[in-house]
């Protein structure tokens, strides 16, 4: 869903960089070298501060080793080789005089997020702490600095008593000796890495023996024995589960390969990633509020790529960057490959650490290779220019406000005459920071992905793919690359970057974007952006969830002056005009929304209520929003923020119920974390409505619901992209009606009027809570009646499963590349991958997205035939019968059935396809069979002839339709399969027919074929003599001569 696209750049440093990391929540990053701390602003890319140690400080503290940054309290903590932790306080002040890029310019051009230009960064040195046990690693948890000892498995937590920059900073410390707890398995190992994720409120530790531990509540515990932790990643356990074990291989070597080298988390999908020494990335699913971890997926890039150095997840959780010693790869949340350095020869470099930009449109990675002062990479022959920086010294440290940044285009072999500046220290190294630009699919910023339209976004524009507009052309080309570029309004993106949400209408006619504040609507037909007229009003509004289009209206959940509101916009002018705007207030933040029908929607809020809202246009032509009803979901969801989408599905039998009762009869499709679950109503004797939970699919990255009725066979079909591939359910609503709900009993058993407080009752709500994470900032505080102990929830996860009928109806689809969207009206899957290029003139290296389009109809029809649903398969094929490539689709169906590995399944498929073709005679199916024969190896021909007729039967159909070209193709197949003599007379008849109708292409083809059979051209001469005598000629001698020559061909 992220694709390398554009021209990568690089920043070169004149000293060896140890670590780079982004300052959370702001567009700044820090570079740590052995003697310096460099602070860069990303937009515009500028070095705004540099802290350099004095000689005295360097001798006392030693070289820098590790760095950790916290933006909430403005803390920078640096660990040194002499066991000191230096603590700094920084503030970013945009109100200070703007720093200019050069003496000749007054300000930067306002690109995305650059309206303030370079911002003043003020830094204060606050204190230094020395830890006698040595410093192995450190991390910042809120206002506490956590670090691990270098001599024993001991964790030290130093909490700042105050973070006021105007006061003297002091710390209070406590220590945890992990040798006192049983869950820390190897007491002789050390803690080599600390990782804290505030979103899931969990600390992760990596030990020197390659294990990974999870810990809940380090700072809240007062002694070591009260710590709760568990081992998540154990190389010994992974080694036992290997299926390809070699008994002669050294066990210690295998354990060393499985040792963890790096870890990261994905809070949006509740996943923990662990990289190992052999280059494998493991994904662990977090269950039972962080108390259980299950290894579900793994990915290994290449044996030559080396160990995993770094793993970084985007803010939306939809992309994972993995850096190796020699290469990099981007993966989907469940470790499906999206893009890799091996796909292009120009950007094949290793990454030691890095981070995603705030809008995830770029990745900043520190190269794994260091360079000497001669410009030569350590261990390689790669040369690169060096950029010198003048260093200054003060007694303690100094902060430089401005420094030039050199950004150059990447070049694998830099043969230009670069000036290598002299550096006093001959042992000094340089490092390179690579900036990789990415295109981001709009799927990641939408509440529910749309069909028919594919979009990709960068920092300053949106790309809309128009490939589908060419699918009905006469050219049989599925891979046309054509994009419409929609540039964001410059003033808006300059001040409100990053663009957090993008919503595209199903037909691509309307687009909405939302940044930090306000929003904007683009009308494609007019090529016009509509924004707020009042800039102050725009600053008061912030969109809280993905926006949705319904008809010509845009629906957005916003926070406006601390009020939680639903806004309804009409794209006909400025967004703050009364005629184009309607509002409805709520008691809490809107988490997600979905459309029910043409004029209604459901809204889910953070206080755990699901609301049914209706909108319309009144008699005066103004928009109106009306509240219908609500349901309390507090007993069902414990963490509302984990709910990514809620879709209301109404069974066909209940289509005419009153709108006010809609929530109490419908089925709810809920995407929570990576689980797609169904909530259906279950009748009880107490006449209360109970929700029954069933899991439809796990490891869900995104899904589509087809609401278009242009293709009736796919109406209400659901397409789900999971960690194991694309899955499809046809006629989804009908399956729901037949499996989950006994509609008649439900209606008869319900009272006409129910008290609202009794509409939802507790049944198996624990099953939905199993996948939620433990986090005080995300857990909804329920009443006393809803409290429960979550320690036993993991036992119930096996009971959460969908019925067998749903599993049987599931169709698995293959998608080559990374799926962008489903073009249901054209029967195509739209995928993408990256290609690298190099301009030979200026040697610029760049990458661009390449579109691939593949028909999905063969796999669906194949699956329907295996499910004994031939009538449904026939209807589906006839629905797409107008497409110019329908014959190609049916031919692919036949060839895939022929190449099925399972022999019994293959026979069933070929038999079903033959019956299918008999009911599709209007498609001239004999041509499809001939096309498949021409492209299939001869060893498979007997199976085709068994079910679709011998060559003479196919020839008969060709002659009945007077299709000379197909007859010529069939003749060649006949000759190869049964010999030349068996088709000699038929050969002459077809040759004569082609001459009669003056089809010279067929004549030339047949003549060439005779020459290939008899290079001496006796066959061709005899055939021409026979045909030259006319159709009434009965020269037996020439006929016998032609037959004898054909028999001679068969002998050889």
Swiss-Prot record:
InterPro entries, alphabetized: Ric1, RIC1_C, WD40/YVTN_repeat-like_dom_sf, WD40_repeat_dom_sf
Positions carrying Phosphotyrosine: 293
Top-rank lineage group of the source organism: Eukaryota
Membrane topology of this protein: Single-pass membrane protein
Subcellular location: Golgi apparatus membrane
Database matches in Pfam families: Beta-prop_RIC1_2nd, RIC1
One Gene Ontology term, aspect cellular component: Golgi membrane
Family recorded in the similarity comment: Belongs to the RIC1 family.
PANTHER family from the UniProt entry: GUANINE NUCLEOTIDE EXCHANGE FACTOR SUBUNIT RIC1, RAB6A-GEF COMPLEX PARTNER PROTEIN 1
The protein, known as: Guanine nucleotide exchange factor subunit ric1
Gene: ric1
